[in-house]
Amino acid sequence: MKTDMRYRMLGRTGLMVSEIGLGAEWLERHSAEEVKAVVDRCEEAGINILDCWMPEPKVRSNIGAAIRGRRERWIIQGHLGATWQNGQYVRTREMKWVKEAFADLLARLETDYIDLGMLHFVDEVREFHQVMEGEFYAYAAELKAQGVIRHIGMSTHNPEVAALAAKSGKIEMLLFSVNPAFDMLPASEDMTEYFREDYGEGLGGIAPERAQLYSLCEQLGVGMTVMKGYAGGRLFSAESSPFKTALTPVQCIHYALTRPAVASILAGFDTPEHVDSAVAYETATEEEKDYASVLAKAPAHAYYGQCTYCGHCAPCPKGIDIAMVNKLCDLAKMQPEVPAALRAHYEGLSANGGDCISCKSCEERCPFGVPVSEKMREAHRLFEGAGR
């Protein structure tokens, strides 16, 4: 079947992946028939990579049924450490649960191998070392030696962890969060500089550690697949976007795919029509893809009071990663209910909004006037309430 889909090499794995992929998380709330409709439309469009991190049994079985008889057409990203315990998602490094959950993934997807075996959700440097130096990585290496997983990857939202993984020589590819809101920060202390008409040229406002990560991965042959490319839908609305101007799916996709090392953006699809709106990227004009001019023309006041996750507020005396807490809170507010993965991410932080002592030293450093201590209380109320 001829499609307009383009394919890219996923780093040194040797795998050619569609530049738009299926991030299957949204399928969790759908019936088997609805899941099959989305998967079928993806296949018709030339999509050949899917990520299934979710341990929930029903969605795994529904995806397995949808790809039945066509398994070899799909490159599957499956996760080690995402488990289902007492009716809910639990991220764990306890090997009993890890092994059971991975066996369940194979059974429900009706396959005897996973193309990309992901060390799931490693966001802190200390945890990275524990994972890589202990039985967790050893288990992944054993599965690879047996041919049960073909390549070892890691999912992380932290550029420092991602860089360590890339340099380790043991991680072949990364699943990493990429979008303009996560990447950009003020280019200078002078806010008017950031909103110059030619700001978008060269995108000088990307956080240095993230720009360095993309270049590092390109140099080392560590391919990237992208999660959170739409920032949970937040970027599609001028009201909810930190830029106060709306971006389209095509613009978000183009942003991700123009980062070095990125091979595929894994978008979430609720319906076949959502697939179509993403795949429209393949035939879009340069004007339709242009995100830089949209961001450059954002009103100069757009950021005021809005967290852009730039990190200028650090350091926090209690060790709170303020940008991460705000990011998780903003993503959670985009959903009718707080997703289990976001709640687990929040609970896994070494310090969270509940640890804020309202010293407000961060607020003095914030270039956008964000009421940080208030945001920390809001985040903690949101996630604590979701956990009950």
Which role fits each region the language model picked out?
Residues L27-E33, D51-S61, T83-Q85, T92-R93, ...:
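Acidic-and-aromatic substrate-binding clefts and catalytic sites of carbohydrate-active enzymes
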